[in-house]
């Protein structure tokens, strides 16, 4: 039979689901409750399309293609309908995509993943997670003001996890090793970048741009690299040799240093003319910047939003040159973020800055949820080193890291609710109710975790367990707005999912059912 999809005539066999016909044309149709080869459920309404003759919005997962159909797979009306469907699902979805500690970290480091790796004794892997976002882990582990610890949910139960000490340990272990870890680098781009300023912002910008394949040279008027880290931090708090070792690792990544060199207005213009990009990362008190013919405001150089680009030029700016900043982690984070913008500029892409994605958040835990989150943690208060200068021992690190509550989602990268909410710019608060569901975590099964507050009642897990004919399986319990998915008769997930556990975890469109 023949029908039209987006004004193109296509052929399809009788009885084929409309969604599959549209997908066969190469057009993606989002869906969260559709399970191929199983009876349709039509609960999420994210897969809607438009019937052109009638103008009706219809669910593509529950209709078979018919002769003569004329379908619009997506237009503004369809997008708005899908967005509304997602916002309704989000109104009852109680779960964080990223943990509060990660969100509050100016460098946006994946703190929960670092903690899990350290708790398992996977120190090398933990370092790799840290250095993905923090170029100077040993340094920052000693001097960071730790906004992440202020946001740590463990703090509301007893005391925050010692995140900075854990980060420091990962960095220190690398410095002690015979051969320090070096991140893989992209193929050389042939592009040359000057970074003016060897403080935390400049060091981070150069490090991450070098990893992206660009030839970087840091220019600084001082005899030593480090900027404010050398001048403003007590040597007892940050031993100079620790700072120098981490700077040397940045040099080992291919970054060149031209120290003891003053950059005046003429030199700056020469750099701009000669190179592919210039990063201004000078510290506080660099009054000469005002003569460099850059747009200025009362606090520093003017740059565009999160891209750190000066207008549409090849000049980018971060750190105190942008605005005064007291936190080393903040300017270091800016240097990392800036590297994405410079890389996009050098590759002649649209300059958008570091990619951001939708992030579900539900706020503070209520006391009734403390016990639920502690199920995946260990009891005991925060550990402190016997001698501050020496940090935590390996055994203490594993114990302290295990105090993490695992607030982030296990399916962070694959959650369809997150992916589609980002694609359709869904607003989590649009249909937000005054009261939210209480978070629960069921760990009875040895392979999966069930978090009912993240469930969108798509019915996929119910249909899969029906197929396996387990004694209990999963089913819908209750009626109306009170309905939940669970194991019948109050049985555990261990009894309900004897056969299909991993299959339902992999098929779940959110992080409600996930692998341990």
Language model features: what each stretch is:
Residues 65, 225, 262-263, 321:
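Hydrophobic pocket-lining residues within nucleotide cofactor-binding pockets
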Residues 193, 209, 216-219, 254-255, ...:
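Residue-level detection of beta-strand scaffold positions
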Residues 1-192, 275-301, 305-317, 321-507, ...:
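Ferredoxin-type iron-sulfur electron-transfer modules and their immediate structural context
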Residues 16, 203, 241-244, 266, ...:
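Residue-level marker for well-ordered alpha-helical positions
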Residues 37, 224-225, 265, 480:
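Positions that flank functional sites
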Residues 237-305:
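A Rossmann-like FAD-binding core segment of flavoenzymes
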Residues 109-113, 118, 127, 156, ...:
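Beta1-alpha1 glycine-rich phosphate/pyrophosphate-binding loop at the start
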């Amino acid at each position: 039979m023949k029908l039209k999809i987006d004004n193109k005539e296509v052929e399809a066999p009788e009885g084929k689901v409309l969604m599959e016909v549209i997908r066969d044309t190469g057009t993606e149709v989002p869906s969260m409750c559709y399970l191929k080869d199983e009876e349709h459920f039509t609960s999420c309404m994210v897969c809607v399309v438009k019937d052109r003759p009638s103008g009706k919005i219809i669910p593509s997962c529950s209709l078979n293609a018919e002769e003569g159909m004329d379908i619009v797979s997506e237009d503004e009306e369809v997008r708005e309908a899908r967005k509304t469907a997602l916002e309704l699902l989000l109104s009852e979805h109680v779960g964080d995509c990223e943990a509060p500690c990660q969100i509050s970290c100016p460098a946006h480091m994946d703190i929960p993943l670092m903690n899990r790796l350290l708790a398992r004794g996977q120190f090398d892997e933990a370092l790799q997670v840290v250095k993905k976002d923090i170029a100077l882990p040993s340094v920052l582990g000693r001097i960071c003001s730790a906004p992440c610890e202020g946001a740590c949910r463990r703090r509301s139960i007893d005391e925050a996890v010692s995140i900075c000490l854990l980060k420091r340990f990962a960095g220190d272990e690398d410095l002690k090793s015979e051969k320090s870890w070096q991140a893989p680098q992209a193929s050389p781009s042939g592009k040359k970048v000057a970074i003016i300023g060897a403080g935390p912002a400049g060091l981070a910008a150069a490090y991450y741009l070098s990893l992206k394949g660009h030839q970087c040279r840091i220019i600084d008027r001082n005899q030593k690299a480090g900027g404010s880290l050398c001048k403003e931090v007590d040597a007892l708090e940050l031993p100079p040799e620790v700072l120098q070792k981490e700077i040397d690792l940045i040099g080992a990544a291919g970054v060149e240093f031209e120290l003891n060199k003053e950059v005046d207005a003429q030199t700056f213009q020469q750099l701009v003319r000669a190179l592919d990009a210039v990063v201004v990362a000078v510290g506080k008190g660099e009054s000469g910047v005002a003569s460099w013919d850059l747009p200025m405001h009362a606090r520093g150089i003017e740059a565009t939003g999160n891209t750190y680009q000066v207008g549409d030029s090849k000049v980018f700016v971060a750190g105190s040159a942008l605005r005064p900043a007291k936190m080393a982690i903040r300017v270091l984070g800016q240097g990392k973020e800036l590297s994405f913008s410079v890389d996009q500029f050098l590759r002649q892409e649209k300059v958008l800055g570091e990619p951001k994605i939708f992030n579900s958040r539900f706020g503070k835990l209520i006391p009734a949820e403390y016990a639920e989150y502690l199920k995946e943690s260990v009891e005991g208060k925060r550990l402190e080193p016997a001698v501050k200068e020496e940090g935590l021992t390996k055994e203490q690190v594993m114990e302290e890291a295990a105090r993490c509550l695992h607030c982030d989602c296990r399916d962070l990268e694959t959650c369809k609710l997150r992916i589609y909410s980002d694609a359709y710019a869904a607003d989590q608060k649009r249909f937000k109710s005054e009261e939210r569901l209480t978070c629960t975590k069921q760990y009875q099964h040895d392979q999966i975790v069930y978090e009912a507050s993240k469930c969108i009642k798509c019915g996929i897990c119910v249909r899969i367990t029906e197929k396996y004919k387990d004694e209990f399986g999963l089913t819908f319990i209750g009626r109306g707005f009170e309905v939940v998915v669970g194991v019948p008769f109050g049985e555990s997930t261990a009894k309900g999912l004897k056969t299909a556990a991993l299959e339902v975890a992999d098929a779940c469109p959110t992080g409600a059912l996930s692998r341990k």
